[in-house]
Amino acid sequence: MIGFLNGGSHGYAPYLTGFREGLKNEGYIEGQNVTLAYRWAEGQYDRLPDMAADLASRRVAVIVANTPAARAAQSATQTIPIVFVTGGDPIALGFIASLNRPGGNLTGVASLVDETGPKRVELVHELLPAISAIALLLNPTSPAAESTSRTVQEAAHTLGQSVHILKASTDAEINTAFARLSELRVGALLVVNDPLFNTRPEQLVALASRHAIPTIYPWREHVVAGGLMSYGTSITHLYRLVGSYVGRILKGEKPADLPVQQSTRVELVINLKTAKTLGLTFPITLLGRADEVIE
């Protein structure tokens, strides 16, 4: 049995599609020769320690966990293999000793998507060079919240922009954060990488549309749902790598000996239909660098 521990919402397809593909590539198919025990925190990260403890008590063969969930799993067991996926630095987060030789019972995939915040600021500036203030939506309970906030603010200040921090760790707080946008008079919104936001693309896109705020997201899935643009790695690709590592561990390999995989592939996705609705025109230079343009 595999434990799948996640801070986001139940059954978010891009997570599971890639993960199942990775498992299948190693010869494992859910419901045939492997079972999964899913635990979704629905953005309530304070539930993760109990969920992790429950999976550990069930003696699952391996635990799959994203950043906040991996921290809970790490506290729950020092023996069950844990395969993480994180947008941050796994060494700085305390998950591993080194990238090549993780050492303990954790290994996984690092996308470094948290480090792309400054690039998102630059992309917004390229699209909207006249704006003087932007908003940053983050989850204050995230381990990466402080570092992400700092790097985004530094990048914005370099471009002469101020940054208003909007905090949300529940659905209600997401709605409240968007409601504040009009009073803040910001020209654009940046949504950070976080399981709470990653598993709610439709909700975030609908709110951005309602408030007519140009928004840049960390994942392609938000743009497919109608968001303006995204810059980041592929969730499906990351979880495919995770699934492959889980399969290898089930075959007997040790997480301590499996180097952390770093996904450096990033993609810029633009939605021209949404841009037209907002009355925006993307510069040719920006369109030319896009990996995908949705019309």
Language-model segments: which ranges?
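Short hydrophobic alpha-helices and adjacent helix-cap/hinge residues
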Residues: 1-295
